Structure formats: C-alpha cells, structure tokens
C-alpha cells in the first residue's frame, strides 16, 4: 500500500480496457478487400473446415473474417463488408463478413433467418 506522499508524486492510473474489435475503430462496419480465402480447423472438441478470409481494411488493418452460411463466392480481390463478432472455436477470428453486401452473395435456398445471410424472400 503506497503512502500519501507516494500517491501525490505518482497518482494511480486507470487501466485501459481492451477493445474487442479494434480494427473497426468505433464504426459498425468496415469495407475491405480479400487478400486470401481459405479454410481452417476449429479448436479441440469441434471438427470442421471453417471458411475464413484475410481482409485488408480501408483503414489499413489486416484482419481475419469468418464467412457464415453454406457456400460462398469469395475469392482474392473480392470487396467485402466486415462487422464485429468473434467465432468462439477459431482463435484469432474476431470479425464476420456480411453476406449479400458488395461482392458477397447471399446464401442460396435460405428460408429462415434470411436477413442474417443476405437471402432474398422466396417467391
């Protein structure tokens, strides 16, 4: 425990809270260009090939974004919109790519939760 004189000389400094999505810089979404589209495997109890893309954002950040839904049309140089939201079983993936925005197509034959996957209303 510091003395009062020590506190006068050097006051207590509040710890800065760590931001969960620093690359967005307080924005709800950011635009970026895919530099690499690939699959990766999740952490221990789960098993799959999760689709992810490395994205260079307009502010210069390079982040990894998860591509949700079944099937996608993304390749290198595709322009995508990114939002915050991590994938619990993929270390280092703290962003989601928005479906149905810019170069990313919506999920085909999607009947429920369509807005989350950029799917149009079926006729």
Curated annotation (Swiss-Prot):
Coiled coil: none annotated. One of its GO terms (molecular function) is tRNA binding. It comes from the Bacteria. It holds the Pfam family Ribosom_S12_S23. Keywords: Methylation, Ribonucleoprotein, Ribosomal protein, RNA-binding, rRNA-binding, tRNA-binding. The keyword rRNA-binding applies. SUPFAM superfamilies: Nucleic acid-binding proteins. The modification 3-methylthioaspartic acid is found at residue 89. GO terms for biological process: translation. GO terms for cellular component: small ribosomal subunit. InterPro entries: NA-bd_OB-fold, Ribosomal_uS12, Ribosomal_uS12_bac. PANTHER family: 30S RIBOSOMAL PROTEIN S12 FAMILY MEMBER. NCBIfam families: rpsL_bact. Belongs to the universal ribosomal protein uS12 family. Part of the 30S ribosomal subunit. Contacts proteins S8 and S17. May interact with IF1 in the 30S initiation complex. With S4 and S5 plays an important role in translational accuracy. This is Small ribosomal subunit protein uS12. It comes from Afipia carboxidovorans (strain ATCC 49405 / DSM 1227 / KCTC 32145 / OM5).
